[in-house]
Amino acid sequence: MNIVVITGASSGMGREFAMQLDRGLHSVDEFWLIARRGSRLKEIASGMQHTVKILPLDLTNEADMTVLTESLEEEKPVVRMLINCAGYGMMGDFTAVPIKEQTGEVDLNCRALLEVTYGCLPYMRAKSRIIQLASSAAFLPQPGFSVYAATKSFVLSFSKALRAELKERQIYVTAVCPGPVKTEFFEVAEHYASTLAMKQYTMVEADRVVKDALRASSKNRPMSVCSLPIQAFWAMTRLLPQDPVICLVQKMREKGTEVIEEEKESE
């Protein structure tokens, strides 16, 4: 049995990957959709053409992670695609965001991604593909988004190294590095701080990011960087010294905070 495994499938990018692959991928027998919200997974599955295995799991919970590994061991499928989308971020100064929120980011964005990848690899064959959702935040340390950016740098670095390790097995790894995407992500991320206006102007739709990611994966590219502004940002981070750019980002944050405070005072 050939399957696609998608984490974070209940909303946002994970949901969009499931929808697009369901319409365009005919060489698999079943989709395994993983997320905490089982009811949302059922809604998504009801609109899909393929058979769907719903796994309402919290990947930060070791017992739930065991459910996934045991399901793989029991059914012994061929994992044709693994798409790791589960993750979240919290904006705000490091000391302003509760430490449990920030260790939770590391746990889900990094450890859970490692465990899912490790668990699926024994069931992958030549031409199988892995898509890891990183972020343009991986390109540069970001004041006010420090932990999230660090976790995505981890994902990008890990994906590049894993790609090299799996080359002889012909398992392809692509890291997806979008800028801001119009999803539920910012409903969580902005609990302690607001998005820079610049990020609001560079937001793109999830379907565009996913189309670009699937195209990059099918061509065995190491990265997918969607939209010209983010491609320009990526080039800038490769050409310019990091320290001045980081200082500029911090100054822009401080200016944005001043504007927000002035608006609040005028209300």
Mark where each language-model region is.
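Residue(s) in the substrate-gating loop at a strand-loop-helix junction
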Residues: S135
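SDR active-site lid
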Residues: E168-L228
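Conserved NAD(P)H cofactor-binding loop of Rossmann-fold oxidoreductase domains
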Residues: C85-M90
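Substrate-binding pocket helix/loop in short-chain dehydrogenase/reductase
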Residues: D93-F94, P98-T103
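Conserved glycine-rich cofactor-binding loop
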Residues: S10-S11
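Conserved glycine-rich Rossmann-like NAD(P)H-binding loop of the short-chain dehydrogenase/reductase
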Residues: H26-E43
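Active-site helix of classical SDR
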Residues: T117, T151
